[in-house]
């Protein structure tokens, strides 16, 4: 993915409006402290048994598998390596050989502890991002700086100061995109503030089932890259969203961090005919007809 992605035009998508007041009330709430639910231990053991007995690949539950699941889990929680500190991940390393126990016996406490810290770290990052928008003067785009958009293989930050610098550049990058779209600083503050507050709102709406799905999906992807686990609730939602995607703009969408990404374009559909969208494009705004674009990041 290039550092500067194009604004993808998504036609005929309906946008649900969220009031600013509701967002502010949600931001004031505390982060949830998530823990496994009673059914998760049984579900984990059944899913593991199904994979080990019925999957076409022979799976051995051992430390090697455990380490792969652990690495995948951390990657899913912090894909861009801009949330966890290096010391956080180092402290998790003591559990790297325990994830076979997590999936085989349904002992999920370790995974939930890591997830709860991830929620806290993300909250800190978005609060810092919002604080950068309080400046009366916009960012100086004349400085010779670069923002590394793809940090999948980057070194993890070793201090809060390094994290802050990463996020300063991220916010500046977001502001630059809006500046190039013709927005003034006041409007940029409004748009990005709303985006980051909505991200905080989503953090505070996290549920135990969200953690469970990520753990099980980490296991499934290690078994086979094209294998996924979806909880019943999310499977239903996924099917609905897939149907809407295919019937609406003619594209298959997926979530990646704060973005909706085009996974594939359906031949002959509206997106294909428009020649405006292609796989890996990020949708940052949508509109209908000649109306203004609505920001959909976050």
Give short role names for the model-derived ranges.
Residues 121-257, 268-269:
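Extended, domain-scale alpha-helical bundle/helix-rich regions
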Residues 1-8:
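Bacterial N-terminal signal peptides that target proteins for export
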Residues 23-183:
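Cationic-aromatic interfacial patches
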Residues 17-19:
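N-terminal signal peptide c-region/cleavage motif recognized by signal peptidases
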Residues 52, 65, 245-251, 258-261, ...:
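Envelope-exposed proteins and targeting segments
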Residues 267-282:
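PDZ/PDZ-like domain micro-motif
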Residues 282-298:
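PDZ domains, with a preference for the canonical peptide-binding region formed by the helix
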Residues 259-264, 271:
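Short beta-strand segments of a lipoyl-like beta-sandwich/carrier module
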